[in-house]
Curated annotation (Swiss-Prot):
Residue positions binding NAD(+): 193-195, 227, 256-261, 279, 314, 335-337, 380
Protein known as: Adenosylhomocysteinase
Residues holding substrate: T57, D132, E192, K222, D226
Listed SMART domains: AdoHcyase, AdoHcyase_NAD
Gene Ontology MF terms in the entry: adenosylhomocysteinase activity
Organism the protein comes from: Rhizobium leguminosarum bv. trifolii (strain WSM2304)
Catalytic activity line of the entry: S-adenosyl-L-homocysteine + H2O = L-homocysteine + adenosine
Predominant place of localization: cytoplasm
Amino acid sequence: MSTEKDYVVADIGLADFGRKEITIAETEMPGLMSCRTEFGQAKPLKGARITGSLHMTIQTAVLIETLVALGAEVRWASCNIFSTQDHAAAAIAAAGVPVFAIKGESLEDYWVYTDKIFQWADGGLSNMILDDGGDATMYILLGARAEAGEDVLSHPHSEEEEILFAQIKKRLAASPGWFTKQRDAIKGVTEETTTGVNRLYQLSQKGLLPFPAINVNDSVTKSKFDNKYGCKESLVDGIRRGTDVMMAGKVAVVCGYGDVGKGSAASLSGAGARVKVTEADPICALQAAMDGYEVVLLEDVVSSADIFITTTGNKDVIRIDHMRQMKDMAIVGNIGHFDNEIEVAALRNLKWTNVKPQVDLIEFPKGNRIILLSEGRLLNLGNATGHPSFVMSASFTNQTLAQIELFTKPDQYSNQVYILPKHLDEKVARLHLDKLGVKLTQLSEEQAAYIGVSPKGPFKSDHYRY
């Protein structure tokens, strides 16, 4: 482990390897490269001090270097203990960006690193957060509430909360008043994923959101592409790398049929699996049925299916009672943000055999075993390398534009959750068309007037559902 200077990575010697893969990724990320061309000279993020908490992958490296090219100072950690690509982290550290991320880091280290991305060398404060899942945002807000005298650190509900609270208490003791100062210095947060967005909306509804936020997840060019087409490619990749199991003919159960569930079902179906879906939402259930999937109760298929994947963003979707009933060597994994979709904590007193990194064999008293991928965390990033560069370019271009919006136009945003305007969503899509050889039909003035739009767009109303 390298700890010199202002970074923590597994092996700085991997930097050259990481740089080669970053160079390849740049050719697959036209949106981000276009941002460098368009905004590089003006440097709209000059003066921005961005704390980034997002999977430290090769694709994220391209995002980080785009933010730097636009004038920002950046400090970065991964938002998941298993999702870091160590060569990507090394390349970014070698380029001079403080990064704190190691694949397989402990939960204790995870929260130490989350603290470090707010600790600038000159003692200054971050003024922007780029978040994925909301952990960086919640770290600051919880600490500020504790400083205000609220009893928010006394009753942890999980091992992770216990570790988080301990880290907050450590910072409270070392730097009294720091959390409140840091909270008040934030101009805005841009949030990448469904789970983090839900956290922000809950804060906003309670009047507890202390700065503006942009919900990047619900940009069409994020949720309908990253969540769907990204999962369509990366889910099966993770299962294959983790297990080498043939999926053709297997029965796979996808829990949830939102955008991530849709992509996951398509991924497994494309690999030849016979896919069944569980859903609580009647609209999503109807979509699944009309897409040709049998919509079932988990309890009715738990003893017969071969593969189980959670995609919901909810907790306790697959519980210990379900896993006890699974057939021998059933594969269990999650592609939602947090590890509590599967009741992993309830498995800890059973016999675990580690097969290889992020693949564990868990044996029940009756003798049946399950294969658990990435300890219930994101298997596409834990067991593989996540979504392909091209689809992440769309997501990260949204992130870049959102950071520019909040940093350069603070007077236009109050302490609410916003979505990027439609013209920027369409811009992100346009930036990715040439790479695929797409040619757009041009509406005439008469055609545009007939449907009530500008010939140059936006082409859909804000409430249109793609």
